[in-house]
Amino acid sequence: MDYLSESLKLHYELRGKLEIQPRAGVSNKDELSLAYTPGVAAACLEIKDDVSKSYDLTRRWNTVAVVTDGTAVLGLGDIGPEAGMPVMEGKCVLFKAFGGVDAIPLCVRSKDVDDIVNTVALLAGSFGGVNLEDIAAPRCFEIERKLKERTDIPIFHDDQHGTAVVCLAAVVNALKIVKKQLSDCTVVFSGSGAAGVAIARLFDSMGAGEIIMCDRKGIICEGGDLTPAKAEIAAFTNKNHRTGTLADAMKGADIFVGVSAPGIVTDEMAASMAENAIIMAMANPVPEIMPDLAKAAGAAVVGTGRSDFPNQINNVLAFPGIFRGALDVRASDINEEMKIAAAKAIASLVSDDELNPDYILPAAFDERVGKAVADAVAQAARDSGVARI
């Protein structure tokens, strides 16, 4: 199928992938008076006296904003907020289909960090959570941080954290196959953007042995001429102060995680890794190294971002269930404990009998995923003290 042309036809036909359906009837005077004036005043006064009642008396409890500025949309780059709307609508469809979450796209016509933060913060009382989407680094880090400071609802940049959760789930199961512990592993990252940093932080929270982050210039190391964002990376990575190229970093490494550029890993670089290496080459549409080349070079398990190869790192395994769980307990945050719980829940859905080098993650359409992730995330929220009900 020619997905581009067929998708364009679908978009012209549907004129939007979302619509609003009323839950209250207004077919007669009494129904109208209950759903709207004068009866609605009773609900307004309840919320006036206790703002938390907005979760009980409106749809806020199940509603998430999907926010973009259109600066990093898929592989299309900075195409603007309006052009990003089809992607945001699609994301909202996935929220509903896989998590039962009502999501509303908000495309903000500004690239200014404070403009975006103020806009979303002022609207936060209408939502139970905010999913940031397709916002370019490094502004995405600052926007997320400032919104967390300004609001009391979960703020989650899926390009960072959704990718990190699914990648961690994949590695958890891959490590079972190669019989290694994450704490004993050297993990090399190619790409220091939003996803790379988030994955590295999550691996660090899980106790990874050594983390080495590489950008276009090579290994990131403390003491160099670093931007503030790179300095933050250097502070928790490369504890042995290694220097050199990506090829240097990969020598003897146990795990490679790529969120960078197509074809930058050669078969020689893959062959230089430790025995039974794990490679997650997630550049799209062309990975850092093709799976067949990686395996021929000695990699034991290979994952990519593509659906036509085994072991796709697909965010849809994570974000619907993560928000479902967070909303169910009215969480004030989505913290590291909740992300790790989500990753472990995803990994657990592949049984030991099923687990093999070409099957380390459940399928995107596996109906168990959303509930398993939601239940694990909700429990982690309770255990970590961010659940409010």
Residue locations for each model-derived region?
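N-terminal ligand-binding/catalytic initiation module
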Residues: 1-155, 374, 379-380, 384-388
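Glycine-rich phosphate/diphosphate-binding loop of Rossmann-like nucleotide-binding domains
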Residues: 74, 79-96, 151, 157, ...
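Short, ordered loop/turn segments at secondary-structure junctions
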Residues: 69-71, 79, 108-109, 134-137, ...
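Solvent-exposed alpha-helices and their adjacent loops that cap or buttress functional pockets
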Residues: 12, 55-60, 96-97, 122-124, ...
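Adenosine-phosphate binding glycine-rich loop
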Residues: 158, 181, 281-389
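Rossmann-like adenosine-cofactor binding region
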Residues: 232-301, 306-308
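Generic structural signal for well-ordered, non-membrane alpha-helical segments
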Residues: 25, 29, 36, 40, ...
